[in-house]
UniProtKB/Swiss-Prot annotation:
The lineage of its organism: Bacteria, Pseudomonadati, Pseudomonadota, Betaproteobacteria, Burkholderiales. This is Elongation factor 4. GTP binds at residues 14-19, 131-134. It comes from Polynucleobacter asymbioticus (strain DSM 18221 / CIP 109841 / QLW-P1DMWA-1) (Polynucleobacter necessarius subsp. asymbioticus). The keyword Iron does not apply. It is a peripheral membrane protein.
Length: 601
């Protein structure tokens, strides 16, 4: 046990986490040079391209240290983005230590801080590492000071390295072995293993990545998953080096995979505890699950519709397959008059939503229309019942509503001092309430309470553009609060288009209605009759634009002549247009649905 070390790497996007992981794997000989490729642990194309890690991965390596002992080190790769913070907390609770990687040229950023605090709360030993010291603009002293000011851990003996060139990587491993404690746990106790991650493999079913805390696990054991009580027979256990290698058993302190013929990913939830099923000789089930398991709840909802309605079944299959690998994705069928059949999907956050969309388009070749993302409102109706509304079309009539509650999140923003004014203006414009403001060295930390609905649309993009990309943020759900929000409907020729409805704050509703209507006017093609585009709140019309009819010049053949002859022809044309308007319907082009997403304040 004393020779095992379990650790993960915490870093902000682009601070070199995956590259450092590559170097450590190479240094310990986990893969031959031929199999080595950049970002070994990021297995999805999107992960590579965006340079982010979404799913947790592991590598079990052996390292011969300078004191002559051979250590087994388990590297558990964690996602870095706030949307996946639950996955991070599970990965961290499987470790005794974490390398805090900070880019020496950029200093500390928000998501690093969020994940680092999570590590400290879980009692994980944090080892600071300064990366990218080969860059000319690297300033290790400033970065050390920032780690001390912002996070509050001692960084005087932080290791410096450059993951790109491989400089100092051995020092990082040595420092980690010296400072991270070996795992505690007892191989003789009843089995308790924490599921760090699970994914679906086409050949063997669900593969669970586990950290064995107590006890041991062999093939042919019967196991029970404690959150839902299902039992399974273990077929294989083993470790990743990042290639999978079967082992005869996994015992306390080790990290490895378990394959037990589970068909549904929903059964093997991240954070759940695996133990032995009762009634096996010499195997006692654990009485208590490991702490910290919670169901992940989606925060953002959007409708996904296939462009061709014939692709509906294909979209359903694609979503089913995606859900095999992403248990936090929820979806249910819904029908829209404008867009036909599709699905209402729930996501952890905006990045998650983008990634799901991208994976559907890339891996499954779908063409999708996405409606504006919404958050879940709690509506207290006049009969006292409470309704959760994740779709504007489900919002009851105004007369039946007592109060509407909206989700509020606490947002931590970090930025260089020169951008504070602009960011504060942005937050105030988004109905934010300032809770706190700290100066930490050259950085400023702002804490705001903001309505989730304001963040969902374009807060992140705006924050990045006004701070030239230097500001970073993380957010967590706080509570539901009463809010004065209304539903804005868009009517085209007096008919409501459900997919274009949005729920906005009353103070912003008229402006929003006008903007959308003006934008739609430019997008809807001219018809043979006038098209009226209106925005309505309840039965009040707040904005209107007309798309003028295309018409033939009926007077072309009249040269000179009597005015009454011309009038007769014009009246006749008018009658025809009127008749057309009664029977004609307007095709709404695809861009119209996207336009809703891009309305500026």
């Amino acid at each position: 046990m004393d020779l095992i070390r379990n650790f993960s790497i915490i870093a902000h996007i682009d601070h070199g986490k995956s590259t450092l992981a590559d170097r450590i794997i190479q240094h310990c000989g986990g893969l031959s040079d031929r199999e080595m490729e950049a970002q070994v642990l990021d297995s999805m194309d999107i992960e590579r391209e965006r340079g982010i890690t979404i799913k947790a991965q592991t590598a079990a390596l052996t390292y011969k240290s300078r004191d002559g002992k051979t250590y087994n080190i388990n590297l558990i790769d964690t996602p870095g983005h706030v949307d996946f913070s639950y996955e991070v907390s599970r990965s961290l609770s499987a470790c005794e230590g974490a390398l805090l990687v900070v880019d020496a040229s950029q200093g500390v950023e928000a998501q690093t801080v969020a994940n680092c605090y999570m590590a400290l709360e879980l009692g994980v030993e944090v080892v600071p590492v300064l990366n990218k010291i080969d860059l000319p603009q690297a300033d290790p002293e400033r970065a050390k000071k920032e780690i001390e000011d912002v996070i509050g851990i001692d960084a005087s003996h932080a290791v410096t390295c450059s993951a790109k060139t491989g400089l100092g990587v051995q020092d990082v491993i040595e420092e980690m072995i010296a400072r991270v404690p070996p795992p505690t746990g007892n191989a003789a106790d009843p089995l308790q293993a924490l599921i760090i991650d699970s994914w679906f493999d086409n050949y063997v079913g669900v593969v669970m990545l586990v950290r064995v805390v107590n006890g041991s696990l062999k093939p042919k054991d019967k196991i029970t998953l404690m959150a839902n009580g299902s039992s399974h027979l273990v077929e294989h256990v083993g470790v990743f080096s990042p290639k999978s290698i079967d082992r005869p058993e996994l015992s306390a302190g080790q990290v490895g995979f378990v394959i037990a013929g589970i068909k549904e990913l929903k059964a093997a939830k991240v954070g759940d505890t695996v133990t032995h099923s009762p009634g096996q000789q010499g195997r006692v089930p654990a009485t208590e699950p490991l702490p910290g398991f919670k169901e992940v709840k989606p925060q953002v909802f959007a409708g996904l519709y296939p462009v061709e309605s014939s692709e509906y079944d294909q979209l359903r299959e694609s979503l089913e397959k995606l859900q095999l690998n992403d248990a936090s994705l929820l979806y249910e069928p819904e029908v829209s008059q404008a867009l036909g059949f599709g699905f209402r999907c729930g996501f952890l956050g905006l990045l998650h939503m983008e990634i799901v969309q991208e994976r559907l388009e890339r891996q499954y070749g779908m063409n999708l229309i996405t409606t504006a993302p919404t958050v879940v409102y709690q509506v207290e109706q006049s009969d006292g019942s409470i309704l959760s509304v994740d779709n504007p079309s489900k919002m009851p009539e105004a007369s039946k509503i007592n109060t509407i509650l909206e989700p509020i999140v606490t947002v931590n923003l970090y930025m260089p001092q020169e951008y504070v004014g602009a960011i504060i203006t942005l937050c105030v414009g988004k109905r934010g309430i300032q809770m706190d403001m700290n100066y930490l060295g050259r950085q400023v930390k702002l804490t705001y309470e903001l309505p989730m609905a304001e963040i969902v649309l374009d807060f992140f993009d705006k924050m990045k553009s006004i701070s030239r990309g230097y500001a970073s943020m993380d957010y967590e759900f706080k509570e539901y609060r009463p809010a004065d929000v209304v539903k804005v409907d868009i009517l085209i020729n007096g008919e409501r288009v459900d997919a274009l409805s949005v729920i906005v704050h009353r103070s912003n509703s008229q402006h929003r209605g006008r903007e959308v209507v003006a934008k739609m006017r430019g997008i809807i093609p001219r018809q043979m009759f006038d098209v009226a585009i209106q925005a309505a709140i309840g039965s009040n019309i707040v904005a209107r634009e007309n798309v003028k009819a295309l018409r033939k010049n009926v007077l072309a053949k009249c040269y000179g002549g009597d005015i009454s002859r011309k009038r007769k022809l014009l009246e006749k044309q008018k009658e025809g247009k009127k008749r057309m308007k009664q029977v004609g319907n307007v095709e709404i082009p695809q861009e119209a649905f996207l336009a809703i997403l891009q309305v500026d304040d």
